[in-house]
Amino acid sequence: MKIFLDTANLEEIKTAADWGVIDGVTTNPTLVAKENVPFEKRIKEICEIVKGPVSAEVTALNWNEMIEEAKKLAEIDKHVVIKIPMTKDGLKATKVLSEENIAVNMTLIFSSAQALLAMKAGARYVSPFVGRLDDISSDGMKLIEEIVQIIENYDFRAEIIVASVRHPMHIVHAALIGADIVTVPFKVLQSMFNHPLTDIGIDRFMKDWKDYQNRTK
């Protein structure tokens, strides 16, 4: 399974890239706004660090304007993927862009019906939001299972990007289901490292090594 980082912060991206565990990056207008830098400049900077898919979201709501904005973003770097919200205009724009071989990540997906429409329109990626579904007492991971099954049934070429990931168990569950990709905030990625038995083991090894050195002086 691929892991994308859900951020527009360069330091977070550089750190995760140095760990060798990320395959791409997803951004959205909210994440970019936190950085107080020009949008296109930041997307270009991210592409220079990560040689994998980098999702950049359009802000237009009309399909014509979405296409115009998407084409400008696609010119930034060959790795840019256009992020488009799941709307009727978004579907129309996705159809046009996919026919021109511009990769689309259809976002804000909350049902298997929406995912099916996105894939029919030609989306390269579909991004179901598991955490937000869990927030309203729905089952986010059940949605992932359904989309995986639809892709298997009809051999769609789209990949699932599990989004709105809140904790490591979301990631593990997605991997067990067979999702292609998870996109995670930096703090969630960091929490994947943690296990109390690992810390206890390191402390014990270091204590034993120090005792050994003291005995053999």
Swiss-Prot record:
**Which PROSITE patterns does the UniProt record give?**
TRANSALDOLASE_1 (PS01054), TRANSALDOLASE_2 (PS00958)
What is the name attached to this protein's record? Probable transaldolase
What does this protein's UniProt record list under function? Transaldolase is important for the balance of metabolites in the pentose-phosphate pathway.
| Entry-linked InterPro entries | Aldolase_TIM, TAL/FSA, Transaldolase_3B, Transaldolase_3B/F6P_aldolase, Transaldolase_AS, TSA/FSA_arc/bac
Q: Can you cite an annotated GO cellular component?
A: cytoplasm
Location in the cell: Cytoplasm
Active site at K83
E.C. designation(s): 2.2.1.2
* GO BP, sorted A to Z: carbohydrate metabolic process; pentose-phosphate shunt
**What HAMAP family does the database record attribute to this sequence?**
Transaldolase_3b (MF_00494)
Ordered alphabetically, the record's keywords are: Cytoplasm, Pentose shunt, Schiff base, Transferase
* Pathway(s) annotated for this protein in UniProt: Carbohydrate degradation; pentose phosphate pathway; D-glyceraldehyde 3-phosphate and beta-D-fructose 6-phosphate from D-ribose 5-phosphate and D-xylulose 5-phosphate (non-oxidative stage): step 2/3
| Chief site of localization | cytoplasm
Q: Catalytic activity, per the record?
A: D-sedoheptulose 7-phosphate + D-glyceraldehyde 3-phosphate = D-erythrose 4-phosphate + beta-D-fructose 6-phosphate
Q: Looking at its record, which EC class is this enzyme? A: transferase
The GO molecular function terms of this record are:
aldehyde-lyase activity; transaldolase activity
Family named by the database record: Belongs to the transaldolase family. Type 3B subfamily.
Which cysteines does the record link by disulfide bonds?
Answer: none
Listed CDD domains:
Transaldolase_FSA (cd00956)
